[in-house]
Design a protein with these regions (language model features):
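Nucleotide-activated sugar donor-binding and catalytic core shared by glycosyltransferases
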Residues: 1-380
Length: 380
């Protein structure tokens, strides 16, 4: 069968990679065109009988916040136009949307109007920001595979019969890492503090400076940045303007870093849950453009209490969230002490992680999603 997959961010690339593997295990001769990153493109190497083509790379797609999207509007609109044309030319049996809602929901409306079957993997967080989108999603999607147990109530209450809970794919990814032998953990004579400043250039520029300030005042720890070559090594060098003896950067090996870490400072996103699955106490941070933040407060803040996946899933403040103005050196220093020297605080966080892991259930999300996609592609 023919599959068209669209992922627009680093987390989507990770989940898309695992989904492609699962699809190929069920359909070894699949014909796949995709928007994604290096992880998704690497799947082709182990699939000699499949036909896999990358259309666009995520480095050209990941824009964060209302203002950033507007400033790249011509690029976004150009990508939408090209995507529509490419789908029509390819004529897939099913279109699979992986997160990335601002772009993907527009394409879903188009593909539905042209008679294609649509499956959305990793539900847009409409329960937090745009409940009005539930109606067009019901219309445009043949299947919606959501990954958070807390979303079940929302889709049940909003009469969305084609929504299915598949479990969280990060459980599969972390389990795969733990059972593999290809580990390259970070070596240090000091306790390692992981710095995860995000997967977008805008995030990196905003959150990394305070992390570096913290490191300069804590020479008793080794601070290691989870770098991404996708962003470009030059940008890290531009931000790290002085030589700090206890700061290093490792690239594209976040799990090796987390497996070696005593604590972490993490930019909000998928990485907060990954850090929790590795049971590393963390402080979560987030900063965006001021106007973007003001718009978000109007549309989102009144609907949700937390921004990190750990807190959202447990519906409690398991980990500290430092957002916008609260993310400054003084607050970070205070919360850093709690996750490093306060044994009771660390134990409370680890207990919260255990609750979250229990709520997520078991592994197998990618395989369940692939099975559902093939069923829908076959008209079942």
């Amino acid at each position: 069968m023919k599959y068209y997959l669209i992922a627009g961010e680093a987390s989507g690339d990770l989940h898309g990679c695992n989904l492609m593997r699962a699809l190929l295990s069920l359909d070894p001769e699949a014909d796949i065109r995709f928007w994604g990153g290096d992880r998704m493109s690497s799947v082709a190497e182990g699939a000699p009988h499949a036909h896999i083509t990358q259309v666009r790379h995520i480095r050209d797609l990941a824009f964060m916040g209302f203002i950033e999207v507007l400033s790249h509007l011509s690029t976004v609109l150009g990508n939408i136009k090209f995507c529509k044309s490419d789908i029509l030319n390819f004529h897939p049996d099913v279109v699979v949307f992986i997160d990335y809602p601002g772009f993907n929901l527009k394409i879903a409306k188009f593909t539905h109007s042209h008679g294609f079957r649509n499956v959305y993997y990793i539900s847009p967080q409409i329960w937090a920001w745009k409940k009005g989108r539930i109606r067009p999603m019901r219309r445009d999607l043949d299947g919606l595979c959501y990954i958070l147990p807390t979303e079940q109530k929302f889709y049940s209450e909003n009469s969305f019969p084609q929504a299915f809970y598949v479990g969280h794919p990060l459980l599969d990814e972390v389990e795969r890492y733990r059972t593999s032998e290809n580990h390259n953990t970070v070596k240090s004579s000091k306790p390692v503090i992981a710095l995860l400043p995000g997967s977008r250039k805008q995030e990196l520029k905003r959150v990394l400076p305070a992390m570096l300030h913290l490191a300069k005042n804590h020479c008793e720890y080794q601070f290691t940045i989870a770098g991404m070559r996708l962003i470009g090594e030059d940008l890290y060098r531009q931000i790290i303007t002085e030589n700090i003896d206890n700061v290093t950067v490792v690239y594209d090996c976040t799990y090796d870093l987390l497996a070696s870490s005593y604590a972490a400072i993490v930019c909000s996103g998928t990485a907060t849950l990954e850090t929790g699955l590795f049971r590393v106490p963390q402080v979560v941070c987030y900063q965006c453009n001021r106007l973007s933040a003001a718009i978000a407060r109007v549309f989102i803040a009144s609907r949700i209490k937390y921004i990190s996946l750990i807190n959202l899933i447990d519906d409690s403040p398991v980990i500290c969230e430092l957002i916008q103005g609260d993310y400054n050196y003084e607050r970070l220093e205070k919360e850093f002490g709690k996750i490093t020297v306060d044994k009771e605080a660390r134990e409370d966080i680890l207990s919260g992680y255990d609750r979250v892991i229990g709520l997520l259930g078991g592994t197998g999300a990618s395989q369940r999603t692939a099975t559902k996609i093939i069923e829908i592609a076959n008209g079942k």
